[in-house]
């Protein structure tokens, strides 16, 4: 009888020890209180339903096609406004141009190459800045900007052409000026944290946004700091990082905690502040509130999106909200004419009316093209009045911008690292394996 009692007593002890919450019961931990409110997914998984967007009755108007001779910075514009590129490409074949080091688990390519006077400059996955002569088909110089102690951790960074120099935002927390012809260092400054996006150039100023949500504005000639602006640090962030947008005398700064500011370009004085959290986008802030897509400015309208699941338009001068839509994208929207083209939830391409956010068309992307939506689609570009979309499972898609109908599908040799760039009617694309190809 005594043995039986001891046996049951032992089972009772084991039950208490192994039960969930025992550490709280015994006083080793404070009792966890379940927070009130509805539990929501960090990222909404639903596609846009037909009823979710008001249908626009206006027609799509695209700008006339234009030929660019240079591509000095990402999206070729400090405002990130897209043009309708004229190209001779038939989207039939691919020609190898040049190659750098490709990605691995600890090294990522996050920015576009740039082109100036037939010279192609790009940053590979090992932080090599490479200059390539497109006319003579040869590498002119290569400069490694990584730190000796951290050569295996190259996530992001970006480059821009500034006068006779190449400005590099380094993943190692440096902003570096290189001579465009030789690659020699002209000046460099240290900043407090890594930079994953390229600089924005405007009015002889360089604007670089760090991973710690600090904006540095430098004199492009000598690297002197003109002013700085600090946002709130966010320790839950996605891998990409946005660029600031500039138009006239206003700088639109997106921070990874969901805040975005309009600052005076001359002195950094705050003009207005807004936030996706303040706008009531979500009932919880315990999520990815990242703004990874670049803000886009057209006249007095700013288009900005968050991973929390909202696309909004605000007035550039006062920050007042013009409209908002339940759309989730980490890729920069394409704004041209009276329309916005973007990828929602990595599942569909949407065309919206710029003025009111009304839906013009929605194109679901076949799951097979991205292995059941596993692989990301990058920002579309507008070429010959067609949307060119790259990403998914090594795919290239051409879409009629007026109707949303797929015109062509092609397989790529590798995953794209950035959206295409178009110079002198030629289309170039950087791949994650370090190759740059021409789409012919």
Give the predicted meaning of each segment.
Residues 14-48:
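Bacterial Sec signal peptide processing site at the extreme N-terminus
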Residues 42-58, 85-106:
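A short helix->beta-strand "capping" segment at the edge of beta-propeller domains
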Residues 90, 94-114, 142-160, 186-203, ...:
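Extracytoplasmic beta-rich repeat domains
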Residues 120, 166, 206-207, 251, ...:
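Hydrophobic beta-strand positions that form the internal "hydrophobic ladder"
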Residues 124-125, 154, 163, 170-171, ...:
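Structural signature of WD-repeat beta-propellers
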Residues 133-137, 179-183, 219-223, 265-268, ...:
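Short loop/turn segments that connect beta-strands within beta-propeller blades
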């Amino acid at each position: 009888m005594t043995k039986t009692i001891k046996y049951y007593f032992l089972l009772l002890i084991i039950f208490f020890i192994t039960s969930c919450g025992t550490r709280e019961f015994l006083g080793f931990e404070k009792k966890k209180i379940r927070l009130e409110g509805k539990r929501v997914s960090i990222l909404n998984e639903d596609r846009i339903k037909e009823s979710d967007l008001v249908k626009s009755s206006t027609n799509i108007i695209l700008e006339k096609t234009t030929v660019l001779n240079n591509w000095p910075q990402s999206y070729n514009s400090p405002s990130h406004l897209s043009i309708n590129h004229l190209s001779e490409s038939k989207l039939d074949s691919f020609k190898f141009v040049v190659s750098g080091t490709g990605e691995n688990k600890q090294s990522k390519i996050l920015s576009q190459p740039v082109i100036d006077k037939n010279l192609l400059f790009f940053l590979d996955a090992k932080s090599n800045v490479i200059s390539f002569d497109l006319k003579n088909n040869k590498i002119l110089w290569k400069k490694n900007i990584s730190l000796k102690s951290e050569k295996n951790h190259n996530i992001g960074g970006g480059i821009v052409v500034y006068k006779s120099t190449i400005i590099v935002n380094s993943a190692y927390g440096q902003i570096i000026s290189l001579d465009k012809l030789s690659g020699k260092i002209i000046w460099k400054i240290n900043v407090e944290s890594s930079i994953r996006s390229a600089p924005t150039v405007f009015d002889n100023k360089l604007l670089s946004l760090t991973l710690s949500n600090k904006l540095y504005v430098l004199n492009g000639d000598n690297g002197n700091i003109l002013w700085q602006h600090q946002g709130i640090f966010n320790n839950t962030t996605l891998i990409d990082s946005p660029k600031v947008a500039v138009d006239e005398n206003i700088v639109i700064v997106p921070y990874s905690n969901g805040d975005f500011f309009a600052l005076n370009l001359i002195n950094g004085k705050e003009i207005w502040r807004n936030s996706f959290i303040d706008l009531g986008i979500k009932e919880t802030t315990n999520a990815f509130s990242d703004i990874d897509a670049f803000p886009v400015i057209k006249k007095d309208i700013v288009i900005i999106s968050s991973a929390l699941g909202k696309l909004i338009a605000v007035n550039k001068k006062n920050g007042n909200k013009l409209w908002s839509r339940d759309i989730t994208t980490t890729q920069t929207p394409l704004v041209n004419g009276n329309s916005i083209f973007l990828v929602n939830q990595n599942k569909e391409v949407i065309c919206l009316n710029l003025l009111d956010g009304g839906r013009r068309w929605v194109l679901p992307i076949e799951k097979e093209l991205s292995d059941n939506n596993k692989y990301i689609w990058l920002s579309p570009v507008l070429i010959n009045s067609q949307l060119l979309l790259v990403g998914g499972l090594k795919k290239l898609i051409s879409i009629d911008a007026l109707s949303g109908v797929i015109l062509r599908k092609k397989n790529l040799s590798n995953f794209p690292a950035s959206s295409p760039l178009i110079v002198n009617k030629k289309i170039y694309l950087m791949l994650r394996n370090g190759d740059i190809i021409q789409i012919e």
